[in-house]
UniProtKB/Swiss-Prot annotation:
The gene is ubxn1. Residues 89-159 form a coiled coil. It is found in: Cytoplasm. Disulfide bonds: none annotated. This is UBX domain-containing protein 1. GO terms for molecular function: K48-linked polyubiquitin modification-dependent protein binding; K6-linked polyubiquitin modification-dependent protein binding. Keywords: Coiled coil, Cytoplasm. The UBA domain specifically recognizes and binds 'Lys-6'-linked polyubiquitin chains. Residues 42-215 are annotated as: Disordered.
Length: 294
């Protein structure tokens, strides 16, 4: 009888009765190999060791009636090759069958372990591939960010150079305009000088003439830097204060932003003051400016 032989074989191999009965029932009594496959596939089921409860109207054998027990033999599955009844196996035959089934089970387990090993290798390959792709994405983002920062710095440096160049160009234009203005007016000053000597007979009035001599064309500026060192140079009296600022930027500011002040009387020069001539700011003929942090 096929079902009893399968169940007995599983029990002899050491499987629990509940597991063996479930394997026989769920495989439809289709042989020991199918039952063993089912046991290996479901060995981790939480209810694998619970008693088997057949569904309503069914028992362990698919062709059995409810009145039959799992050990009863249905007439429809009698062994036609051996006659009307299956001869019981001898002890030696039973041991050989158990050994064969154990070898089969070991082979199936080895196949499953190999399959799981291959699946593990594939999962590890996929994990490494995903890790490499993620690393490449991060590197690309970092490279893009560094490139963006470098472009921004180049842009800022270019804008700074252009701003300094505009100031230099303006200073050059102002110098040229002053040169043309004062160069053309020198003759008229020479022509008007003789009448200025006419009131020489009245000494009290001549004493008011010296203020006219204070109309200096040059201005000496001394600048005290943040580190205590000083810069000193000469500017035209009509040059704007921006010329002094550019001079400091090019010779001692070290790229820092700063203010220009006069210590006494104390005055902090603003951006509007940068366009005013040194004469108008009272820095002629000489002055001391101090650099302070902005």
């Amino acid at each position: 009888m096929a079902d009893c032989t399968t169940l007995d074989s599983l029990l002899e191999m050491g499987f629990g009765r509940n597991r063996a009965e479930k394997a026989v029932a769920h495989t439809g009594n289709q042989g020991i190999e199918r039952a063993m496959d089912w046991l290996m596939e479901h060995e981790n089921d939480p209810d694998i060791d619970e008693p088997y409860v057949p569904p309503a109207g069914n028992t362990l054998g698919p062709a059995e009636e409810q009145s039959q027990s799992p050990t009863e033999i249905p007439e429809s599955i009698e062994d036609t090759e051996e006659g009307n009844a299956r001869q019981p196996m001898t002890e030696e035959e039973r041991k050989e069958q158990v050994k064969r089934l154990e070898d089969l089970m070991k082979a199936r387990q080895e196949e499953r372990r190999e399959r799981e090993r291959q699946e593990g290798i594939e999962r590890e390959k996929q994990r490494r591939k995903q890790g490499q792709e993620l690393l490449q994405v991060r590197q690309k983002l970092q490279e893009d960010e560094m490139k963006k920062l470098a472009d921004q710095r180049r842009k800022e440096k270019m804008e700074d150079r252009l701003a300094k160049q505009r100031v230099k160009d303006k200073i050059a234009r102002d110098r040229e305009e002053r040169a043309q203005k004062f160069g053309g007016g020198s003759s008229s000053t020479g022509l008007s000088s003789p009448p200025a000597e006419a009131p020489a007979l009245s000494p009290p009035e001549n004493q008011g003439a010296p203020p006219a001599k204070k109309d200096y064309d040059d201005c000496r500026i001394q600048v005290r830097l943040l580190d205590g060192t000083t810069l000193s140079t000469v500017f035209k009296a009509q040059e704007p204060l921006a010329a002094v600022r550019v001079y400091v930027q090019m010779n001692g500011a070290n790229g820092q932003d700063f203010n220009l002040i006069t210590p006494y009387p104390r005055r902090v020069y603003t951006d509007l003051d940068m366009e005013k001539p040194l004469r108008e700011l009272g820095l002629v003929p000489s002055a001391v400016l101090v650099v302070t942090k902005k």
